[in-house]
Amino acid sequence: MIISLRVANDNTSKEFIKETITKYHSYVPSTSSVGRRIDWVVFNDDVPVGMIGIGSSVYPPPKDILTHTKLSMKEYKDNFNSFASNWRFCMREKIKNAGTQILKELRRQAPLYWKQKYNDNLNYLITFVAGGNNGAVYKADNWSQIGETAGLPKHKSVSMKWDSKESLKEKYVKTTGEDKKVILCKKIEHNQNTSTSKSK
């Protein structure tokens, strides 16, 4: 088994990713996202078997992110582009021990392509895990579980990242715990290999 990640730069890989999410993601079969985005196709011995992607972080952030990173809201906002959210991780088949290999390679490639595409240093990866999952694959890669979201009714679980303070007040929805997510975070170590040559 040789696991590799290749950035989705062509229509074929993008269609593969769209189909993978739509057909195989267990609880959020949506391919839409807001803001920045870089996706990879996951290969096992040169056979495409899944996808993983990162995108813009969340705003406003859950307080657990601020507590873990020791940042104020203003500092987080000023450093917003140094955070990325692992917005999807979806496999078409179960492959033993593949998860940690994929996440390790993501940590190697993500800061390189983030810098290349957006000219920002990537310092933190975060992810939100729901659907009854506890984030075991992330924990096996030494991500820290830093908290949980309060949970919104599923029909109200939408991004309000770009709303003003006034519109946020209008859209306020009482938390219910219905769609609670586990929050995990991984600090990027910038002394990792700085070459993208391993990606094909």
Per-region residue spans from a language model:
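Short amphipathic alpha-helix that is part of the acyltransferase structural core
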Residues: 1-35, 41, 47
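Acyl-donor binding region in acyl/amide transferases
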Residues: 7, 36, 44-47, 54-180
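Active-site beta-strand termini and strand-to-loop segments that position acidic
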Residues: 42-45, 186-188
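Conserved beta strand-loop-helix elements of the APE1-like EEP
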Residues: 181-192
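Flexible, glycine-/basic-rich loop-and-beta segments that form/coincide
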Residues: 192-200
